[in-house]
């Protein structure tokens, strides 16, 4: 099984070099094509492109100006699993993982990325911001979906082909998963959703769903889950699988308040 997550906007402030084993992003050459486009943007253009405040636009302008095109491991880079710090990654809590769990995740967990396309947990990346939904003109078209769709779908098929149970588990957001061409996927796809129930009303609440996705990914990696039936047994933080509102391709979990 291969589990997919979205990245995060909030990043770790890198204060020291990561000294353990890391890997190079699989699609680094393509990512650098986008970096070269972003290096030509002014802070004002970055603000317009991503609807950012002046302060955030300046930060990301500096990030792209300082981006090392040679991807030198000593040059402000860090493993994706630890660099991302948003709600999903709070649920994932990777700092609590054992080395063997991280090693297992390296071939069973993927992170979709607007800049890097697809990342493995230990892939060394530089701080950046570039959401998948951004309308950045590039040689392939008017947005990042045009740039990444075929490439990312192909890499997913390649990785799934190496799995003992080749099923794609989608824990990514709609914005990011749209980059995957489902018609070109060669293997089954299962999407997992999390809902809150209060007074018989079901709601998906963004921040809570994000944390739950991270918790589910952690559960799958730490327990080396390799079947849908095992996924259904997830019960952290009060979430329980609901058979009535689920289907073979959509597993839905509910937490009752």
Swiss-Prot record:
This is UPF0246 protein lpl1317. It comes from the Bacteria. InterPro entries: YaaA (IPR005583). Belongs to the UPF0246 family. GO terms for cellular component: cytosol. It comes from Legionella pneumophila (strain Lens). GO terms for biological process: response to hydroperoxide. Disulfide bonds: none annotated.
